[in-house]
Amino acid sequence: MLYWLTQLLQGQYHAFRVFQYLTFRSILASLTALIVGLLCGPLMIRWLRGLQIGQMVRSDGPQTHLSKAGTPTMGGVLILLAITVSCLLWCDLRQTSLWLVLLVTLANGLVGWVDDYRKLVLKNSKGLPGRWKYFWQSVIALVAVSYLYWNASLPVHTQLTVPFFKTVTWDLGVFFPVLAYFVIVGSSNAVNLTDGLDGLAIMPIVMVAGALGVFAYASSNAVYSNYLGIPYVPNTGELTIFCSSIVGAGLGFLWYNSYPAQVFMGDVGSLALGAALGIVAVVVRQELVLLIMGGLFVIETLSVILQVGYFKYSGGKRLFRMAPLHHHFELKGWSEPKVIVRFWIITVVFVLCGLATLKLR
């Protein structure tokens, strides 16, 4: 909305022309989301406490987690609010890719909200049954990828770009929706599995989102994309601002989610933000780069898959002390802050490797 206003004013006041630049609006979007998160955080925490919406803790988990019982959750609503407000203020709302990404994010947030509401308010320990959660995630993803597939007007829209190789691309054709579906749903659930310690998930989300914003910016510019050897995807520049909003909102949330956490994001936050990373990667054609930069989420997910599979086929034996992997290290004696910071460091390495693909081709 403010972007539209500056468009009207720039003819009379040349200073407003600065709002044409994606970089400037991205900075403003990030700061706006950060301020919304910081200012609304205490209000959200008090509101959640008043509703007695507190985290339930697994009795078979690390004993240090018992003190977390009752900590307000569903704080992901705050993150989504900050992102939405920031995007509405600073984005060019005529760009359809922005609306697609924003709607996929909010729709997955709604699925997570229903799950949290059933568990915490209705006191249904199972929340939204897994099959229904997966069903609605699938519906959202299929609608999104179908829209992208049927509106693909350029070969790049359905091509898979291989990192580190300048000219290696595969035209997925009818298999594009399949890949895109698994990226969106897989990313959503991977982030959800990672969100198990104070601040563990939100900082990697911030880092990956920031890096995806760089790819969105470069991909939307014909000159930059040609120089860097990445796909040129027109009309995706506003996703840079969307990713910047995630960065600001995530940092604002981390202020209250850092150890010891005053609030948790809940499924409403983790499912939404995971889906956001997935759909942005799909739109800017960087699915494999997301696999690299989101390596922590991949590792956490694989630890759960391996644990369940090994337990089933070994007659009850466990590969890890507990899954997801962060709980394994806690039970080995690592303090929670040490696990969190070390996993953040791992994410920094993965994100730098992903960004390196911009030049190493």
Curated annotation (Swiss-Prot):
Coiled coil: none annotated. CDD domains: GT_MraY (cd06852). Belongs to the glycosyltransferase 4 family. MraY subfamily. Catalyzes the initial step of the lipid cycle reactions in the biosynthesis of the cell wall peptidoglycan: transfers peptidoglycan precursor phospho-MurNAc-pentapeptide from UDP-MurNAc-pentapeptide onto the lipid carrier undecaprenyl phosphate, yielding undecaprenyl-pyrophosphoryl-MurNAc-pentapeptide, known as lipid I. Its cofactor is Mg(2+). It is found in: Cell inner membrane. This is Phospho-N-acetylmuramoyl-pentapeptide-transferase. It comes from Legionella pneumophila subsp. pneumophila (strain Philadelphia 1 / ATCC 33152 / DSM 7513). One of its GO terms (cellular component) is plasma membrane. It catalyses: UDP-N-acetyl-alpha-D-muramoyl-L-alanyl-gamma-D-glutamyl-meso-2,6-diaminopimeloyl-D-alanyl-D-alanine + di-trans,octa-cis-undecaprenyl phosphate = di-trans,octa-cis-undecaprenyl diphospho-N-acetyl-alpha-D-muramoyl-L-alanyl-D-glutamyl-meso-2,6-diaminopimeloyl-D-alanyl-D-alanine + UMP. Keywords: Cell cycle, Cell division, Cell inner membrane, Cell membrane, Cell shape, Cell wall biogenesis/degradation, Magnesium, Membrane, Metal-binding, Peptidoglycan synthesis, Transferase, Transmembrane, Transmembrane helix. Its EC number is 2.7.8.13. HAMAP family: MraY. It is a multi-pass membrane protein. One of its GO terms (molecular function) is UDP-N-acetylmuramoyl-L-alanyl-D-glutamyl-meso-2,6-diaminopimelyl-D-alanyl-D-alanine:undecaprenyl-phosphate transferase activity. Pathway: Cell wall biogenesis; peptidoglycan biosynthesis. The chain crosses the membrane at residues 27-47, 70-90, 97-117, 134-154, 167-187, 199-219, 236-256, 263-283, 288-308, 338-358. One of its GO terms (biological process) is cell wall organization. Its main location: membrane. The gene is mraY.
